Structure formats: C-alpha cells, structure tokens
C-alpha cells in the first residue's frame, strides 16, 4: 500500500469523525494506531515507522488548523499512556510520566508524535471528547462518558479496521426530565 493512499484515507476518516463528533477548539482527540495492522500484519508484530509518521502528521495538520489537541495512545507495554503537548498536560493538570516510546513499546504513532509535536510529553491518563482507533487498539478507556460510536464511511485504513468514538453529556433525571438537543444524537 502506498503511503499516499494511507494519508488520503486517514484524512477522510478524521474529517468525518470531526464533523460527526462536533469537536470544538481546545478539546482533545485520541488516536489509537497499529501500523502493523495497517500494513496487513498482526498488532504489535510488524510496526512501521513510515506509516506512523504519515498518519500522525496528517492528523496533526487537520487538528492544528482547528485548535484541537491530539493525544496518541501507546500500546499496553506503556499501559496505554499517551503522548500530548506539554501545554495540554499543564493546562489540564495531567501527570507527566517519564518514558520515551520505542517502535515496540509505545509504537510508531507515539514515535511520530514525538517527532511532529512541538513539546511532547507522556501522560498516563486523559479524558478526550472523541477519537479514532486504527487497528483495534482499544481507545475507549480514554474517551469521556457517554461514548457514542461513529461509523466512518471508510471501514479500513490500509488493512486495519477503523472505529471511532465521540462523547455526549450524560442524560440524568429519568422520564420527568427534558433534554437539550445535541449534534451527536440528531440523527438518532
């Protein structure tokens, strides 16, 4: 698969997820990425730095224009810690942890985030408003409740299965309560 094709597919999926999730400036978008799955391998076994770089660089270009922060999830060897900009970690009072990702501990996406972000750091936990999962990496633990599945028109980037999540405010109060309309549930 050509890197150009991966870039185009990534761009299409991320733009759709942003549109459907109604993410706003200052909010957080999580990326879970298995470059191994993108190139047709098994998660964690065939990592590709080139794929990680093209995916992360493409997403950062889109998010930076909108003022949305990117958080890049690492693999289970790093307890699914995330690379974020130091500015975000300070702003949200996130605990910074001391680890540098490698190709097989953190993965290609995290290495790319360290290359392309201005001042990257690792944090252990985050609560993001939306995200995309390329290769079934399980990003749900980092998405705010209540999570709403999003189905992008492309179901794969390369050979990796793609899913996405947005979030909405919890509905409380039961049958007597009235609720405001929100963008995510309009189509429901």
From Swiss-Prot:
Name of the protein in question: UPF0340 protein SSU05_0314
Pfam assignment, any one: DUF436
InterPro entries registered for this protein in UniProt: Antibiotic_NAT-like, DUF436
Entries under SUPFAM superfamilies matching the protein: TTHA0583/YokD-like
Family: Belongs to the UPF0340 family.
